[in-house]
Amino acid sequence: TIARATNQLNKPWCLNVFVDNSGVIDFDGENAICFKVETHNHPSAVEPYGGAATGLGGVIRDILGTGLAARPIFNTDVFCLGEPDMSYDELPPGALHPRRVFKGVHAGVADYGNRMGIPTVNGAVLFDERYTGNPLVYCGTAGIMPVWAAKPGQQSPGDLVVLMGG
């Protein structure tokens, strides 16, 4: 597995992998970079805006919960959706039209990230009929933290986290 291979390599710049809310690597000896991605497919198929927004919110939360809290610095996304020109007659029963899903997931990810003040720096969109009714909505966030704060399990009850969006 990827986890086993990474652990066998035992690189000193891999500070926190497969044990906390996100993977952390040493960037320059003083700063560490962390990254987390996940999918939010079914929720986005049912309610595109909310499903995608909460998918992005989950990875932002995981960055904040890594070690002693990283600062989110950017978001990324990949959307795989059904063909946008599909006729409504071709839709499976209960499926939303791919155009509606696309507009909703795009707006959900954009709104959530923008309101938090975290830019989306890249993304991709793939249209294929196989994603009709079952989109792939892949969201990710990167963060930065001091190397000393990258180890898991150092939080204490009563610690406070303050996050303000714009």
Residue ranges and their predicted role:
Residues 1-166:
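Long, structured ligand/cofactor-binding scaffold of large enzymes
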